[in-house]
Amino acid sequence: MAAITPSWALETTADGEVKEKTSGPGGQWRALNVGPDLIRSLLIRKFKTPTPIQRAAIPPALSTPPRDILGMARTGSGKTLAYLIPLLQRTGSTHHGQGPRALILCPSRELAVQIYTVGKDLARGMNKGKGKGKNKNEDEEDEEGKGKEGLRWALIIGGEGMDAQFEKMSSNPDIVIATPGRFLHLIVEMHMDLRHLQTVIYDEADRLFEMGFDVQLQEILHRLPSTRQNLLFSATLPSSVAEFAKAGLVNPLLVRLDAEQKISPDLALKFFSVKPGEKEASLLVLLREVIGKPNQPEPADPSSAPQAIVFVATKHHVDYVAELLRTTGYRTSLIYSSLDQVARQQQLAGFRSHQSDVLVVTDVAARGLDIPIMDHVINYDFPAGPRIFVHRVGRTARAGRKGTAYSLIVKEDFPYLCDLHTFLGTERMGEPADVLRSLPIEQLSENVEYVFHNLDETAPHITALRNVMRKGQGMFERSRTKANPTSYRQAKSLASALSNNPPRIDDMFEDAMEVEVNEEKARLLAKVAAFTPSETVFEVGKRESESAIIMKKRRKTVDERQKRVSKAEAEKSTASGMEKAPVKELPAPQLPSKNFKDPSFYLDHTQRGAEAEKGYSLKSGVESLSGAITDMTADEGTGPKAQKASQLSWDRKKHKFIKKNGSADGEKMIKSESGALLPASYSSGKYQEWKSKRRHMPDGPVEALALGGGRRGRHGPPGQKRKAEDGDGGEDAGGKGRKDQGKSKGTGKGKDDFKQKSPGKPGKKGIKQSSGLKSAMDIRKQREIAQKRKEKNARKPQKFRK
C-alpha cells in the first residue's frame, strides 16, 4: 500500500509557473486528464482551479487500471468534486441501459440529496457541451430523431415511497446515490443485479464503516462485483487501511492532505465556560451578539442576513431549544433523524432560502452539508469525540470564507475539551485554561431571569419540554463514550485552576472599561462561590458561649501545630538532600554543553501522532470490547435447554410460547445470501405487487425495461403450459376449455357478480381468479347494466307522472 502525497498535488498555481499544457482556460483541469466536456461544465460553474485533494485524487482515479483511493482532506476542500469528476469521466454522458454502473453511499439523507443535486448539475453541463464538434454519425442520428439519452440518476433514501423508488431502479439508472439501509431494502426486495457496477464511492467513509452500518454494508458488499473500483473520502480518516478491510480494497492509494491541520485556518474557535443552569441564557446572549436581536425587520437583501447552526445532543434538545428560540422571536428550523423526510426537506430548504435565522440540529447534519454563506456554528452540547467536533465546525469556513465556532462548556465537558486539545494540538487551539472565556454577567443574569421566570409564565409548554430534555440529557450522559483517562486528570486540575482564577470575558462583547468591571465582578463571585466557613453549623450564632470559645482555641492550636509540622518537614527534606548530594551535584557554574542527540534517530516512548490517530480511529472502546467477547457453550445437560428456552417468548395473542427468529426484540428475520440476518420486511413482496399493477398499464420506456421488454404474447416458449389469464381457461385452469367458461353453479341473472367463477369443490382444483383485465364483452355488458340502472333511477315516481 502506498501512503504518499504526490508532490504535484501540493503545487501552487502562481502566475508564471503554469506550463504549456496548463495554459488557457481549463488548462489546469486538462493537466489532470479531465475531458473537454467536463472541463466546460466546470468552467461554467466557476470551478477554474482544482483544489489540492482534487489534484491528488483525480489522476490515480482515472488511471488504467483504476486504483482504489482513500482520500482525506479537511472540510470544505472540494472532496465531492474529487470523486464526481472521475466518476463522470468514466461513465460518460449517455445512458447505456445495462443497470447501475456507479454507486455512491452516504450516511445521511441530506448529504445524499446534496450530492445528487451537484452531480446532476455537473452532468447537465456535459450534455450541453455535446452540441459542438459532432461527427457525421451523430448528425445523422439527430436528423433521424435518435439522439442519445443523458445519464440517468437515482436518489434512493429512506422516508420516501417505495413505489417511486421501484420505478427509478426499474429504469436501469446509471448512477445511484443512496443511504445503506434503504438501498439494501431495494436490493433484497427486487433481487437486483449489480454485476455491471464499476465504481463504488463511500462518502464520509469513517461514519459508514462504524458499527451502526455494519450489517447493511456487509450485505451490500457481498453482492458487488470484485472488479469494482473503490473510492473512500472523508475529513477524518485513519491512516490504517485495515479498518476498511471490509471494503475489499486492492492496492489502495492513501492521500491524506492537511493531516496536521485538521480544521480550516480561516476558522476561529471560541470556548465559553458556563454553568448547566445558564446554557439557555448563554445561547440567547451568543445569538444576540452573532445574529442580532430577535424580531428585527428583514433586510433588503435576505441572503446577506447572518445565520447560525446550533448543534445539540438529542432530538429532545432539538424540540426544546427550537421552541425556546421561536418563543424568543427567532425564526427557527429544526432537523433530527426521526423527523419525517418531507419535513426535513422543507426545514432545510427554508433555512437555505433565508426564511429562518437558526437551524437546530443533531449530528445528523454534522457531515457533508454545504450551506452557503454560513459564518457561525454553536455547539450547545459539546461533542464526545474530536471527529464529531471537526465535522460540526466544518459547516463554516468553507471554500476560503471565514467563520467562527462557539462552544458552551460545562464542568462535565472538561475531559472532552482536553481530548480535543490533544487531537488538535497546542499550536492550533492553545491550552484549555487559556482558551476558555466567560460571558458578561449582567446579560447572563437578565436572560436567566427571562428564561426561567418570564417565559414559564407566558409559555408554560416550555417547562414540559424542559423536563423531557433533562431526562434525555441524563440518558445521553450515561450512554456517551468516555474520554481518555489522562484527560480526566487534566480536567481536575483545570477545574481547580478556574475556581481560583475565573476565565475572563471575551473581547467580542464590550469595550475595555466595561470588561474590567465585569472581570472584577466575576472574581468576586468566584471567591464567594469558593468560600468555606471555618465554623461548623453547630457554632453559628453561639460565638460567646463557652463551647464556642473552647472550639475556637482548639482550632487555633491545631492550625499552629500543622504549620510547625509542615515547616519542619520541608526543612528536613532540604537538609537531607544537601547532605546526601555529592560534590559534583552541588551548585556550580554552568558551562555551555553540546547536545549530541540526533532528533532524526531518537525514539520517543510513544509514536509520533499516535493521539491524533486515536482520534481518527473508527473503533471506540465499546466496539473493541465487543470484539474480545467469546460465547462459551455450557458443559452440562441443563445448558442447551436453558439456551433453547431463552429463544422462546410468550405471545399474548396466541397464548403460547413462540420462537424468536433471530432478533433480540422478537422481530422476524430472514437469512440473506451472505448469511446475514435481515428484517423480514425487506422481503415483503411489495415489488411483486407493484410489478403486477404495472404490467397492465400502457407500455412505456420504464415499463418495458422493468418487465423485460413489455408483456409477452399469447404463445409462450415451446413446452411451457399456458396460464389461465384474462378470463381465458388455459391448461392450468380449473375448467376443461373455453366452452366451460361461465357454467359454474351459483350464478343468477339478478346478481351483479354472475361472471365470478366458483372456487370449486374441496379436493379438486378450483378455477383461478381473474387477473383483473376485462375482455371487450365484459366491458360492454357492464356498461349496459350501468346504463339501465341510470335510466331506472332517472324515472319520476308514479304519483308525479301525468
From Swiss-Prot:
PROSITE patterns: HELICASE_ATP_BIND_1, HELICASE_CTER, Q_MOTIF. ATP binds at residues 73-80. Residues 60-255 form the Helicase ATP-binding domain. Its main location: nucleus. Gene3D superfamilies: P-loop containing nucleotide triphosphate hydrolases (3.40.50.300). Residues 557-572, 733-756, 777-788 have a biased composition (Basic and acidic residues). One of its GO terms (cellular component) is cytosol. Residues 126-147, 555-596, 632-802 are annotated as: Disordered. It comes from the Eukaryota. Keywords: ATP-binding, Helicase, Hydrolase, Nucleotide-binding, Nucleus, Ribosome biogenesis, RNA-binding, rRNA processing. SUPFAM superfamilies: P-loop containing nucleoside triphosphate hydrolases. A motif (Q motif) lies at residues 27-55. A motif (DEAD box) lies at residues 203-206. It holds the Pfam family Helicase_C. It is an enzyme of class 3 (hydrolase). Residues 789-802 have a biased composition (Basic residues). SMART domains: DBP10CT, DEXDc, HELICc. Residues 286-447 form the Helicase C-terminal domain. Belongs to the DEAD box helicase family. DDX54/DBP10 subfamily. The Q motif is unique to and characteristic of the DEAD box family of RNA helicases and controls ATP binding and hydrolysis. ATP-binding RNA helicase involved in the biogenesis of 60S ribosomal subunits and is required for the normal formation of 25S and 5.8S rRNAs. This is ATP-dependent RNA helicase DBP10. The gene is DBP10.
